[in-house]
Structure formats: C-alpha cells, structure tokens
Regions:
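Phosphate- and other anionic-substrate recognition elements at nucleic-acid/protein interfaces
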Residues: 1-191
Length: 191
C-alpha cells in the first residue's frame, strides 16, 4: 500500500492507495495550532492513528510493527515548493513549509521505518493522468477530476456551496498516493 501526504502548515491531506484503489483519505486541520511545534505534535498523533490502522494487527493481539495483513510499503510526499510563485509565497512562508515538510517526512520515517519518496505536484498529476488546462487552477481541476473518476471520494460544501478547504488537500493527497502507486508499478516493470 501507498501512503500519500500533501503537507501544509494549515491543512495536511492523507490518502492510502492499495493496488491503485483508494482505500482511505482524511486530513488534519492545523490552523488552530499557532506554532510549528504544536503542529508537529498534532501531525505525530495523526500519523500514529494511520500507523495503527495500517501497520498493526488490529485483532486485539499485541502484535508488533508490520503485522498488518496489508501494511503501508511506501510513503510519497508532495515535494515542497522551491520558488516564489507570483506574490503567493513569501520567503518566510516557503521556509516554514520546507521546515515542516522535513519534520513530517522524518516523523513518517521514524514511525514506520520507510524512507519517504518525494514527488512534485505537476509530476504527480501527470502520473495520475490529470491535465490542467492553461489558465485554470490546478487544485480545482484535481478536485473535479476526482469527483468524476473516484467513486470513493466525497466532499462537503460550505453553506455558500463551495468545497470545504480540506477537500483540496485530501484530493492532492489522493493524487500523490495514486502517483506513488503508478511510480512503483513503473519501477517494478523496469526491474
């Protein structure tokens, strides 16, 4: 199984894909935590929950690491931004995001002893078969694509009829996980 993570200091999305099929997705809202340390503690708790769901034997026996019938074998994380994007990101924002990306990457490695792989958002969308037409917002295109093609993917709307913010992060995590699955398939074919 593949765990895909779309890391952000506001809302982080998670998705698990098995054999190319979405089996789990969720997010954690970190906006209520005011510093990177509190955000890290919340992330660790969320990753532990996922670890317990997919790495442990949940039949009540006190089995150890990796005893799940279908454990997570690979972790894919969206690569953090490395450049300014036309007034969208300040140096401070990029620095904080990169730092948090590194912390969460380490937490994932520490908890499940799997070295995360990093994939850029554009590359992930390409691997997942999503094309973003020029001039359109990638997050909106991804959301619409998944709503059309992924029966397990459901979103909630605000009272104004807009997708709730976590919908976009969950969708991005699904794309990262599906891209990770496709990349692993490509690696197996080459071997």
């Amino acid at each position: 199984m593949i765990l895909g993570i779309d890391i952000s200091t506001s809302i982080t999305g998670f998705a698990v894909v098995a054999e190319g099929q979405l089996v789990y997705y969720d997010s954690i809202d970190l906006r209520k935590y005011k510093n990177i340390f509190d955000k890290t503690i919340a992330m660790k708790e969320k990753l532990l929950d996922i670890y317990e769901m997919y790495q442990c034997n949940n039949d009540g026996a006190a089995a150890g690491f990796g005893s799940s019938e279908y454990p997570i074998q690979h972790i894919y994380i969206e690569q953090s931004l490395h450049m300014f994007m036309g007034g969208k990101s300040s140096a401070k924002t990029l620095s904080t995001l990169t730092r948090f990306n590194g912390i969460v990457s380490w937490l994932g490695f520490e908890l499940v002893e799997i070295r995360p792989e990093f994939v850029g958002a554009t590359s992930a969308r390409k691997q997942a078969g999503i094309k973003v037409p020029r001039g359109q917002k990638a997050k909106q295109v991804v959301l619409e694509h998944l709503l059309k093609t992924e029966p397990a993917f459901k979103i909630e709307y605000t009272k104004h009829g807009n997708p709730k913010p976590e919908s976009f992060d969950r969708a991005d995590a699904i794309v990262i996980a599906k891209a990770g699955w496709q990349l692993e398939q490509n690696n197996q074919e080459k071997a």
